[in-house]
A protein has these predicted regions:
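Alpha-helix N-cap/helix-start motif at coil-to-helix transitions, marked by capping-box chemistry
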Residues: 55, 128-132
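Short, contiguous acidic/charged loop-to-helix segments that flank catalytic cores in large enzymes
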Residues: 124-129, 140-145, 197-200
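Short acidic, glycine/serine/threonine-rich loops at helix termini
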Residues: 14-23, 128, 194-195, 219-221, ...
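Short loop/turn motifs at secondary-structure junctions and domain boundaries
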Residues: 54-55, 162, 197-200
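Long, low-complexity intrinsically disordered regions
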Residues: 228-235
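Polyanionic/metal-chelating signatures
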Residues: 1-123
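C-terminal cap of metal-dependent C-N hydrolases
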Residues: 28, 107-114, 119-120, 133, ...
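C-terminal helical cap
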Residues: 60-67, 71-107, 137-189
Length: 235
């Protein structure tokens, strides 16, 4: 069995708060204590969206617990249970950004020969990975302390990722393949997105082609939308 994984260059993740409970045992005190001690602390779990409680946005679980006069364990349990009961698999009622990793581990995983460099997020996920992942890896994770050469980095972003998920003629530049191409200045490529402003455009990206159509020209969007749904082992 071939094993692979997707990795992005940040110490914080983003998802529904319910993802902290894989067994969905939200009222298990021991489980909640374990989460706060070993996965993410109450100070490191911040709501970036909440349809039921808009006033929770940009507050941590610790902040909300303090305002409610409850323990952090009680509050995490309550917030997660409420979110699960009132949300659905296709429509979460909230999203959090939570620190749960360290840079040395992130570098180790990025450098693993079988890992894909991916963003794992879109532009509206309130996490800088959506706009900053690839420029950040290019600018900060090259060399002996990172992933090595620029060529290896690009390979892990493109051909390796496409191969691992079964996409035909993607991630390569050759006759007959789909023309998904990025023209960038490696010396001046830099991510600008942050946790407080996650949609800032990166620097150093000149032009982008998707399926042979130019969608970014001299750093400006062309208005073209040639993207398509990609399916495993399909044209």
């Amino acid at each position: 069995m071939n094993i692979t994984t997707d990795v992005y260059p940040y110490e914080a993740w983003s998802s529904s708060i319910t993802s902290l409970y894989p067994e969905r045992n939200f009222n298990d005190i021991k489980e909640t204590e374990f989460i706060l001690e070993n996965l993410s602390s109450a100070e490191d779990i911040t709501f970036v969206y909440h349809s039921l409680h808009p006033d929770y946005v940009q507050k941590t679980v610790a902040d909300i617990a303090n305002e409610a006069g409850k323990s952090e364990v009680e509050m995490l349990s309550h917030l997660s249970d409420e979110s699960y009961r009132l949300g659905s698999a296709s429509s979460a009622v909230e999203y959090v950004v939570a620190k749960g990793m360290i840079d040395s581990d992130v570098r180790l995983l990025l450098n693993w020969p079988y890992s894909n460099v991916t963003s794992d997020g879109g532009l509206e996920c309130s996490h800088p990975r959506g706009c900053g992942t690839f420029p950040k890896v290019i600018s900060q994770y090259r060399g002996e302390d990172g992933l090595g050469s620029l060529e290896r980095i690009i390979y892990k972003m493109t051909n390796l990722s496409a191969t691992n998920i079964g996409l035909k003629d993607r991630g390569v530049i050759k006759e007959g393949a789909f023309a998904d191409i990025v023209m960038f200045d490696a010396r001046n490529t830099k991510d600008n997105s942050t946790f407080s402003n996650s949609t800032l455009q990166s620097e150093g990206i000149d032009s982008v082609w998707v399926n042979g159509t130019r969608v970014l020209n001299n750093g400006e969007f062309t208005g073209e939308l040639p993207g398509r749904l990609l399916l495993k082992n399909k044209e």
